[in-house]
Amino acid sequence: MTQIPYIDEALNATVGCSGRDCKCRPTCWAKGDHDKRHKAYLAGKKMPLQYAKPFHEVQFFPERLERALHWKKPRRIGISFTGDLFDEQVPLKWIDDIMAVIAECQQHQFFILTKQVKRMAGMLREYHIHNNTFLGVSICDQEDADTKIPDLLRIPGKHWISIEPMLSPVNLRDYLPIETIGGVEMEPWPFWIVIGAESGPKRRPCPHEWMIAPVEQCQAAQVPVWVKAVSIDGKVVHDINLFPKELQVRQTP
């Protein structure tokens, strides 16, 4: 099981991230959790082996991939959500092992998310991207959108975009099939968009208006959108029933 609500399972075969091009670094939940456990490990407490090393040293645990081979019921599986699968430290052999499991488990859907979309494009050039694979990019603002989404859409396969944490307004119209609101119709376009406010004690504000705009654009384009978390009265809220009506949307591809 996983605490990430839009997937059923997380296979964290890689752990860690170098932090390059990481606007979310101050509040990264994966880094914060790992840092606390790494500190406990160094203090002599009994902890899983992955916490022996700091978060900026990317590690590989290929044995974790075997779980997917034993699940018969179809599941939505996130790959390496406790790091960046296409971090500069990750060798092609690790990618090869992961893609082999994905190819063997056609009953599942696999969701890959990276900030290093150019490296993902280069490393996946020689692979056949199966229909059960969703390749995603993590963005935080319009600069990210305009520099990373075009590179994502050039990779063969299905695509998704995570705007989390959302740190400023993001206009998706140029990347969605919405001629009626000025977008450029293009194919392939994203199959799915996830949007979420920043969490953690150092979180930055995310007004509802920022989130409403891309939600409405996705709805106009009939692209599924999932609103994960909203800032309400200074608190991060995950209960969809407490969201503003315009943001009570949780769709899957």
Model-derived features: where do they sit?
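Conserved AdoMet/S-adenosylmethionine-binding subsite of the radical SAM
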Residues: 59-230
